[in-house]
Amino acid sequence: MNYVFCIIGIIGYRLCLEQLSIYNNLYNWLIKKGYSVILENNIAQALNLNNVISGSTFDIGEKADLAIIIGGDGSMLRIAKILSNYPIKVIGINTGNLGFLTDLNPKSALSTLNYILNGNFYEEKRFLLNVITIKNNIKSKKHILNEVVVHSNNVAKMIEFKVYIDDVFSFFQRADGLIISTPTGSTAYSLSAGGPILMPLLNAIIIIPMFPHGLYSRPLVISAKSKIKIKFSKKILNLSISCDGTSPFKVYRNNEIVIKKSKKFLKLIHSNNYNYFNVLRKKLGWSKKFFKKIK
């Protein structure tokens, strides 16, 4: 048999009984089909199986052809930052809530995976953003798949900032914060803030002021080729940045924040019968009333 993928990694964080049964069933199913399987270390320890190959997420990224992520979108976000460094392809089994990134249903995951492992899939290269903090010419860098959020440390406290696009001043804003989102992140926090939904492969970035103090402030969609720079008012004391929902870190009024497209991509794969608008309709409840009337 000619395998599309030879070595498959299984990754996940939650180790409750329900999750463990999914890990166990998936592992045994792949082994019976003749694949080499690498279990992430914590899964291997929890399953306590004999003669298993285990490793870190980095090991899986380096050695495997495909990683199967079991969890929610949060799990995928955490893992994306590591696996985007490798040519490995990624697919997710959703045991979380919405599951925009982990789109396989646990109940039908094996049958869908069987279809995919026979070559019936396509790849989406989801770009990441670089978030660069500059202070006294010293740079620190983070990578995000969904969004970066700049906000005050104090609840309901506005911040003042200037936004430059390609080093040209674009606008000044007083707001609770600012969201910079990728197309992948357009169905996450950006959506809750009133941002548009973008097709995943659009080469674009969303800029959304959060609760702006101004009647004419609107979300912007710009080319992902552009560089975004944020400068803060000298009046502002307490600022933080959150990257993909992780614990915020402090920034200061004399810091500059530069955000631009990374050279890294998450290589996400889907079944050939996957359709993004079907996902939006199901996840967001579009057209429910319409279909009820027809019935």
Curated annotation (Swiss-Prot):
Annotated GO MF terms: ATP binding; metal ion binding; NAD binding; NAD+ kinase activity
E.C. numbers: 2.7.1.23
Sequence positions that bind NAD(+): D73, G74, R78, N146, E147, K157, R174, D176, T187, A188, Y189, S190, L191, S192
Catalytic-site annotation from UniProt: D73 (proton acceptor)
Leading EC class: transferase
Subcellular localization, as worded in the UniProt entry: Cytoplasm
Top-rank lineage group of the source organism: Bacteria
Any one cellular-component term (Gene Ontology): cytoplasm
Keywords: ATP-binding, Cytoplasm, Kinase, NAD, NADP, Nucleotide-binding, Transferase
InterPro entries listed in its UniProt record: ATP-NAD_kinase_N, ATP-NAD_kinase_PpnK-typ_C, NAD/diacylglycerol_kinase_sf, NADK
Catalytic activity field: NAD(+) + ATP = ADP + NADP(+) + H(+)
Known cofactor(s): a divalent metal cation
GO BP, one annotated term: NADP biosynthetic process
NCBIfam families per the UniProt record, alphabetical: PRK03378.1
Family: Belongs to the NAD kinase family.
Biological function: Involved in the regulation of the intracellular balance of NAD and NADP, and is a key enzyme in the biosynthesis of NADP. Catalyzes specifically the phosphorylation on 2'-hydroxyl of the adenosine moiety of NAD to yield NADP.
Name the UniProt record assigns to this protein: NAD kinase
